[in-house]
Amino acid sequence: MAKKKKSAHYSGIGGQAVLEGVMMKNKDDYAVAIRKADGEIDVEVDVFRGLFPGSRITKIPFLRGIFNFIDSLRLGMKCINHSAQFYEDGEAEETKLDKALDKISGGRGEKILMGFTTVLSIVLAVAVFILLPYYLSTLLNGFIRNDSLLAIIEGVIRIAIFLLYIVAISLMKDIHRLYQYHGAEHKCINCIEKGRPLTVYNAMKSSRIHKRCGTSFLFFVVFVSIILFFFIRVSNPVYRVLLRIALIPVIAGISYEIIRLAGRSDNILIRIISAPGMWLQKLTTKEPDEEMLEVAIKSVEAVFDWKNYLYEEFGYEVDESWMKDGALSDDSEEGTGEE
């Protein structure tokens, strides 16, 4: 069958980098591929059920973003813990806390710890990125009386903390490799969404930047929070803090709808609002090596039939001759791809 003109087609898959590996998710199925210390690739496939599987409330615009955000944190934490097990020094001994939790919860101690870790992560993120900028801006109350200017300063501080955090952790060796796997994840998705057979060569030529990336989502969270906090104000300092906490679900819901729209559209407005988040991905993704791409490809193939996808979306069947290096590959489009 004749091949259709190539353009980006939404695939529905997404994922994240984990320690020495990549997690890919397609609908309820997800796979975690890990490069073990001996060089072999371990692939685990499972089904993830959200907080309210099948419930209509998780489909309602703006509300769905809240549930999606929580589910992403839960799954992400689970996959990172799974990948960490491959690089622990020997078998980790079960602690007294583990035994006590298992006894009390009927063997659900690991899930309880995972839930606690997720909640703690959210609390720390709120403290650092929401409450700290507000507190620092209040230190200027004696010098600046204009509430609008203080709101702008709070937003600038929030952006500065966000950028400093990204830059600081990128200097860590392990995080640098995590960012390389992050780039591998993006390259694989961009490769198939551009209509190319998923090979190491084709993936390497694809962009490591993607519009549906979590980095872009976090940028929208910061941006939306600045706008909401600027226009929605109260005079009481305690109420100001409570208001910022109460608006977090609203911020997450709005940000999710923006990035969801960005992943399905490509008009000039979408490109403009997506640009800052995609620029930030220059910091949170790095160029992967071929072995990292092999891991990412294994993860994709465990949950997604990319050959059937190419046939349905681009109108051609993949044969073995196309799987050779350079087959159906365009020039590198670094910085222009979408996740």
What annotation goes with each model-predicted range?
Residues 4-18, 53-59, 98-114, 200-206:
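Cytosolic juxtamembrane amphipathic/interface segments immediately preceding
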Residues 1-88, 92:
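Divalent-cation
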Residues 82, 121-146, 221-245, 252, ...:
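Juxtamembrane "helix exit" motif at the C-terminal ends of alpha-helical transmembrane segments
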Residues 48-49, 53-56, 65-69, 76-94, ...:
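Multi-pass alpha-helical transmembrane bundle typical of ion/small-solute transporters
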Residues 98-108, 135-153, 232-242, 261-271, ...:
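Membrane interface segments of multi-pass transport proteins and intramembrane proteases
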Residues 113-129, 210-221:
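Select subsegments of transmembrane alpha-helices in polytopic membrane proteins
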Residues 2-14, 18, 22-24, 144, ...:
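Polar-ligand-bearing catalytic/cofactor-coordination segments
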Residues 110, 114, 118, 150-158, ...:
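Residue-level signature of transmembrane alpha-helical entry/exit and packing/kink sites
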